[in-house]
């Protein structure tokens, strides 16, 4: 996500606490109710995780309901838990829960996700434009001047996301080919010549939304 919004009063109280702790801030360029993590989007998650014993980069491949608890299994035994929250793309959720909740798995499998190619750009100097966000322009679904977000520093960096249709049509491209094809699309969308690149890379999110 490029940003998050706050509408529920309980969430608003939490975001106010994050703001006081310096891990969230408003991002006016995206609108009056847009917020981002600072210095990165994962800062609020890191702040919450600091209060708990969290296992990162742990692959869970199976769930078992046993004696009123949940047994998680991956490369080894991941432990027993009172509850499981599944926050995965529908395709992956269906595979994970099928043995314990086939009806839920069927519903998840019927909701395919759309892919997204994302390109990360850094330039040697600022792009001569006052635009910080580009929406729905040709193959570009969303482009953000990442340096316009609070806490990001002064570097001229952009994150460019292709539309779902373009991403699906070019799903199996190599990352460098996807980046190379989207760069001129971004230049056309921004409406001005781009300065020299310092960095260009791409990542494919197969299950983006």
Protein language model features and the residues they cover:
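Central helical "cap/lid" subdomain
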Residues: 78-132, 192-195
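Short beta-strand to alpha-helix junction loop
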Residues: 3-7, 24-49, 169-181
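Active-site substrate-recognition segment that forms the wall
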Residues: 120-191
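Generic structural signal for small/hydrophobic residues in well-ordered secondary structure
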Residues: 4, 48, 85-87, 121, ...
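A short alpha-helix-loop-beta-strand transition element characteristic
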Residues: 1, 10-35, 57, 105, ...
């Amino acid at each position: 996500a490029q940003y998050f919004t706050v509408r529920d009063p309980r969430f608003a109280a939490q975001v106010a606490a994050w703001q006081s702790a310096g891990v969230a801030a408003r991002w006016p360029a995206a609108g009056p109710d847009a917020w981002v993590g600072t210095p990165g989007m994962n800062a609020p998650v890191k702040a919450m995780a600091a209060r708990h014993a969290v296992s990162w980069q742990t692959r869970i491949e199976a769930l078992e309901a046993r004696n009123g608890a949940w047994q998680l299994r991956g490369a080894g035994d991941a432990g027993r838990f009172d509850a499981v929250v599944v926050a995965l793309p529908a395709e992956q959720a269906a595979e994970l829960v099928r043995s314990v909740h086939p009806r839920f798995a069927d519903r998840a499998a019927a909701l395919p996700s759309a892919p997204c190619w994302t390109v990360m750009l850094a330039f040697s100097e600022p792009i001569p434009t006052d635009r910080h966000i580009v929406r729905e322009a040709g193959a570009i679904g969303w482009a953000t001047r990442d340096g316009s977000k609070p806490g990001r520093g002064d570097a001229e960096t952009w994150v460019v996301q292709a539309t779902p249709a373009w991403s699906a049509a070019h799903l199996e491209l190599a990352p460098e080919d996807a980046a190379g094809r989207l760069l001129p699309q971004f230049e056309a969308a921004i409406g001005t010549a781009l300065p020299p690149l310092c960095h260009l890379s791409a990542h494919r999110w197969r299950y983006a939304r």
